[in-house]
Amino acid sequence: MTEEAFAKVLRAHGARVFIVGGWVRDALRHVRPHDKDYMVSGIAEADFQQLFPDAQKVGHGFPVYLVSIDGCLSEVAFARKERKEGQGYRGFRVSYDPSVTVEEDLYRRDTTMNSMALELPAKTLIDPYHGARDVEKGIIRAVSPHFTEDPVRALRAARQAAEFGFSIAEQTSRYMHACREELQGEPQERIVAELRRALQAERPSVFFRALERAGILSVTFPELSLLIGKTQPPEYHPEGDAWQHTLLVVDRAASKTANVAARFAALVHDLGKGMTPKAMEPHHYGHEQRGLEQLAAWDWRVTLPKD
């Protein structure tokens, strides 16, 4: 089924259909978009199932279907609203009845650049929160204070700043700081997933600087935060403390190799300097062994990047 045919069937039954998410953002960035995600509104789930009986339901907390469109299995979600009722990213009550509008769905999303939609079939841009303007200016901006309701959005904003070379709006950085407490209870798999993607960026240091600026480095990567302010002999390290040195090294590694494990090794190569007693600075005798001991105990709490 073509995209045009998919939209035509839905529109014939009073529904609206949109391309949403990263595909829209990347198209505006003039970067080749990848997988398309679709959203439908104005139709009940049962009616959708009747129209597309071969669609495979994969969503649990809210309905998401896999539909073959233009030869690819694409995700199709229903427009929905969310209300925070508990801790973390699972603490939401979701409603997705046909009355939910596209604007309401886009409002629940994290940043303006991710809160745009293209309505089919004409691909008319729906941009109630000025995401296109922020993409043009290279700014990551939260749609609303609801940004804080999923704490890992703070890491995602930092990671996307590194990926796209964007800056983070001041208010959004404050929202990131407001995620500090809940971040401590998040599954480490989610945090490491953002780390892995950040290490794939051209300049991974942007990710860590954004976390530091927002005051959440110490709760997401506490061992790294100990490097801040650790002095080094200026004749060997004119760049400054062990933290500045680490960020320079990880960016240098990124310029030499795309291998995530090698970039991770660069990130933690001086980890033991964070444990150096103040009286010993600016020297860090034995920091190599201390770093190995930290990694052995740390193990990134789940798994180290390997590729």
Language-model features: where?
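Catalytic cores of the polymerase beta-like nucleotidyltransferase superfamily
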Residues: M1-D307
